[in-house]
Amino acid sequence: MPNTDVSSLSMLGHQTETASSPEEAVLEKVPSNHAGTDYVVRFTAPEFTSLCPMTGQPDFAHIVIDYIPGEWLVESKSLKLFLHSFRNHGAFHEDCSIYIAKRIVELLDPKWLRIGAYWYPRGGIPIDVFWQTGKPPEGVWLPEQGVATYRGRG
C-alpha cells in the first residue's frame, strides 16, 4: 500500500483555528493512490449550521457530499473546518449548498460530484438543495443518500 506524503498539509496533525468565514477557510487535498479506479467517496455532515442572512437565527442541515475522485482527495480535517466556518456566516440555503460543492470541485477537479443539502424547516418549509456536476461514470455503485424526506409529525 503506497504512503501518501502529507508534509504540505497545514492543518492535519496541527491545532487549527476555524476560519471566520467560508471565503477565508482553507480546503486542502491529498493525492489519490487509486486515481485510475472509479469509486465513490461520501462525506456526511448531519449537523451543519449556518445563519439566516435576514434574521441571524441559526439554520441547520444534513449535508451529503458524494464524489468520484480523479487525481486528488479532499483532506477531511480541512473539509470539517471549512464546513464549520459557516457556523457564523449568513447566507441562504441555496447559496451555502452550491458554494460548498463548487469549492470542492474547484479544489479537486473530481470526475463527478453531487451534493444533497437537506435543510430543516424555516418558516414551516424545509428546503432541500441538490446539485451535481453531470452524469456519473457508468458502472459505479452510487448508493442513495439515505436522508428521509422531512415529515414533521405527519
Swiss-Prot record:
Gene Ontology annotations for the cellular component aspect, listed alphabetically: cytoplasm
Supply the enzyme class, top level: oxidoreductase
Taken from the UniProt record, the cysteine pairs bridged by disulfide bonds within this chain are: none
Q: What is its EC number?
A: 1.7.1.13
**Keyword annotations:** Cytoplasm, NADP, Oxidoreductase, Queuosine biosynthesis
GO biological process terms, alphabetically, are: queuosine biosynthetic process; tRNA modification
- What does the record list as coiled-coil region(s)? none
> Secretion signal: which residues?
none
Q: Which reaction does it catalyse?
A: 7-aminomethyl-7-carbaguanine + 2 NADP(+) = 7-cyano-7-deazaguanine + 2 NADPH + 3 H(+)
What Gene3D superfamilies does this protein's entry cite? Answer: 3.30.1130.10
The record, for Pfam families, names: QueF
Q: Please list the residues that bind substrate.
A: 74-76, 93-94
Q: Which residues form the active site?
A: 52, 59
Q: Where is this region: Disordered?
A: 1-26
Q: Does the entry feature the keyword Oxidoreductase, yes or no?
A: yes
As for subcellular location, the record says:
Cytoplasm
Q: What is its main location?
A: cytoplasm
What is its pathway?
tRNA modification; tRNA-queuosine biosynthesis
Q: Which InterPro entries match?
A: GTP-CH-I_C/QueF, NADPH_dep_7-cyano-7-deazaG_red, QueF, QueF_type1
Gene Ontology MF, one: preQ1 synthase activity
Please give the family membership noted in the entry. Answer: Belongs to the GTP cyclohydrolase I family. QueF type 1 subfamily.
Q: What does this protein do?
A: Catalyzes the NADPH-dependent reduction of 7-cyano-7-deazaguanine (preQ0) to 7-aminomethyl-7-deazaguanine (preQ1).
Protein name, as recorded: NADPH-dependent 7-cyano-7-deazaguanine reductase
What does the record give as the organism's lineage?
Bacteria, Pseudomonadati, Pseudomonadota, Alphaproteobacteria, Hyphomicrobiales
Its gene is queF
